């Protein structure tokens, strides 16, 4: 899936990605980044996974 980083709080280690197709926001945790640094507005690819409180982004990669 693809989306745009709505915001990412580096000090708290989480943020949200807006899904490009649905417009829905999906939670992203620092543990899903594998060392990738996210900035607000970055375009990303990710895998939608089921978390404890609903859908979360996993395997997040920044794209051009």
What are the roles of these predicted feature ranges?
Residues 1, 39, 62-64:
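Long, polar low-complexity intrinsically disordered regions
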Residues 1-7:
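Structural detector for short beta-strands of small beta-barrel domains
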Residues 12-17:
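Short aromatic-glycine-enriched beta-strand elements
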Residues 24-36:
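Beta-strand/loop nucleic-acid-binding surfaces
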Residues 33-45:
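Short nucleic-acid-contacting surface segments enriched for D/E, G, S/T with interspersed K/R
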Residues 49-64:
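OB-fold/S1-family single-stranded nucleic acid-binding modules
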């Amino acid at each position: 899936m693809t989306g745009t980083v709505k915001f990412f709080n580096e000090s708290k280690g989480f943020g949200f990605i807006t899904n490009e197709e649905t417009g829905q926001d999906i939670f992203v945790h620092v543990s899903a980044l594998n060392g990738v640094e996210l900035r607000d507005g970055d375009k990303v690819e990710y895998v939608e996974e089921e978390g404890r409180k609903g859908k979360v982004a996993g395997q997040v990669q920044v794209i051009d």
